């Protein structure tokens, strides 16, 4: 048995109940779902292909590596969690990705040089998730024992000691809690812990970084693995846009070890690699990327937290995320010239092939000095790959409104310049004044108009080239001081 082998090796080595979307709440449903202990063996037999592993819990939309994040991922259906482990100076194991507290918490400095008493004085703080998560009391950094006690045997856990000093204590805890059958050892592909885990009979999650993506490095990594392990590759080269060559993925797949990509944020990215025969995806938004239907027909900006499927270019970036500036508003106002959000929570639109309308309101806090500045709504995309004006990876259209009131409709695609389909003049926008906009999509035509000015001109275009169901919205302006606020976005 795996557990028996793991125990021997380890001893030798180290002689929607509560609503999980509400910050701070969420009760794991794993115990209600499981009919028996979930082991690596049972998960491998039942997971099918493709499968998904929850990355940092649901780290795109919840404070990463927190109990609410892990609970949310399990509530979404995850049967495998990825968990990072560090150790404090007094030997307490905690769940945190970085070696220091700086990036994700209110604490400062290295975990390893501070005692566990610091945990009572800090909390997880990731502003890009929304102000609902930055209110007091902040979400706590959990102890590993708390995580293993709640989820052990209910889901598979991929455990990584980010600080290698934590590895012996981490594995001793796993053994003490009788969880060896339910744990996969996660480690960097060249780690000395991989042969140690293999010798103990434990399966391995071996990952590469973008800098490692060569045939030679992949060959060396897979030489240490077998079909019971996972070879985990980055899905992009670090720009969140560019996929690796098909030939490289084929070479990795040829070794026979199940191939997994990470960290997946968008459905299109998972679909691309699944078509190449990749077995699984490590995803930071399990409930979104593991499904293919819309979760809502209107925004949830009043909640003051990012929604599942709502994606800036880089989901972990504070500078590219929206901000929540009033009761029900999302504001785009960073120092970036282009700031766009994929509205995946509303996608794919169920009526994409027939007729629907999009309605929302927008206002600039001050009018941009840049004459080319515009609000932009991208629509009819075939997938949820990232879009911003001037960068389109999918076929579709975008509708714009300039501060001078001009409305325009364009068609765009990855291999052709934007094509202006039509335009109309409406009264100029005033700073702080809300404009309500409406886009109507039918099988043969597109209408873009000001719903707040029903007698003004509209753009009517007869074009049926693309009718996908994905959306993005954003602003383009060289005048980064002008923030654009959005509210009341709905699909009907």
Enumerate the predicted regions with their spans:
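Secretory/extracellular carbohydrate-interaction modules
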Residues: 338-407
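Short, aromatic/His-centered strand-loop micro-motif at the edge of beta-sheets
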Residues: 413-436
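N-terminal export signals
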Residues: 1-17
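C-terminal active-site rim and adjoining tail of enzyme catalytic domains
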Residues: 134, 207-321
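Short carbohydrate-recognition loop motifs
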Residues: 318-342
């Amino acid at each position: 048995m795996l557990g028996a082998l793991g125990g021997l090796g380890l001893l030798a080595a180290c002689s929607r109940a509560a609503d999980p979307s509400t910050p701070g709440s969420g009760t794991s449903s794993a115990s209600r779902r499981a009919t028996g202990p979930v082991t690596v063996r049972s998960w491998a037999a039942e997971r099918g292909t493709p499968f998904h592993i929850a990355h940092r819990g649901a780290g795109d939309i919840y404070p990463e590596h927190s109990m609410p994040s892990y609970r949310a991922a399990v509530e979404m259906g995850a049967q495998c969690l990825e968990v990072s482990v560090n150790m404090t100076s007094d030997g307490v194991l905690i769940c945190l990705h970085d070696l220091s507290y700086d990036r994700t918490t209110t604490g400062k400095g290295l975990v390893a040089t501070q005692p566990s008493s610091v945990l009572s004085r800090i909390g997880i703080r990731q502003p890009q998730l929304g102000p609902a998560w930055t209110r007091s009391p902040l979400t706590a950094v959990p102890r590993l024992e708390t995580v293993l006690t709640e989820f052990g045997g209910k889901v598979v856990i991929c455990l990584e000691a980010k600080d290698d000093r934590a590895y012996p204590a981490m594995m001793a805890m796993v053994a003490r809690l009788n969880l060896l059958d339910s744990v996969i050892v996660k480690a960097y592909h060249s780690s000395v812990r991989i042969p140690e885990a293999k010798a103990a009979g434990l399966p391995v999650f071996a990952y590469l970084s973008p800098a490692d993506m060569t045939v030679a490095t992949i060959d060396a990594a897979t030489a240490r693995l077998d079909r019971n392990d996972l070879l985990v590759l980055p899905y992009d080269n670090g720009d969140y846009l560019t996929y690796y060559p098909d030939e490289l993925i084929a070479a990795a797949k040829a070794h026979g070890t199940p191939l997994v990509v990470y960290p997946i944020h968008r459905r299109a990215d998972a679909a691309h690699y699944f078509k190449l025969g990749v077995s699984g995806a490590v995803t930071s938004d399990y409930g979104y990327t593991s499904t293919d239907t819309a979760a809502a027909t209107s925004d949830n900006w009043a909640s003051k937290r990012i929604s599942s499927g709502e994606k800036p270019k880089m989901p972990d970036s504070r500078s590219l995320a929206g901000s929540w500036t009033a009761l029900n508003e999302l504001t785009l106002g960073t120092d970036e010239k282009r700031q766009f959000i994929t509205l995946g929570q509303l996608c794919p639109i169920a009526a994409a092939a027939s007729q629907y309308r999009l309605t929302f309101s927008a206002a600039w806090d001050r009018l941009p000095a840049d004459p080319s500045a515009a609000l932009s709504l991208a629509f009819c995309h075939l997938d949820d790959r990232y879009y911003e004006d001037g960068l389109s990876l999918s076929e579709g259209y975008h509708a714009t409104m300039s501060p001078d009131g001009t409305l325009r409709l364009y068609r765009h695609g990855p291999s052709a310049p934007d094509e202006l389909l039509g335009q109309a003049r409406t009264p100029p926008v005033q700073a702080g004044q809300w404009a309500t906009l409406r886009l109507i999509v039918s099988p043969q035509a597109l209408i873009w108009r000001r719903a707040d000015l029903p007698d003004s001109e509209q753009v009517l275009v007869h074009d049926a080239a693309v009718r996908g169901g994905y959306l993005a919205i954003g602003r383009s302006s060289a005048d980064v001081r002008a923030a654009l606020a959005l509210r009341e976005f709905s699909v009907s």
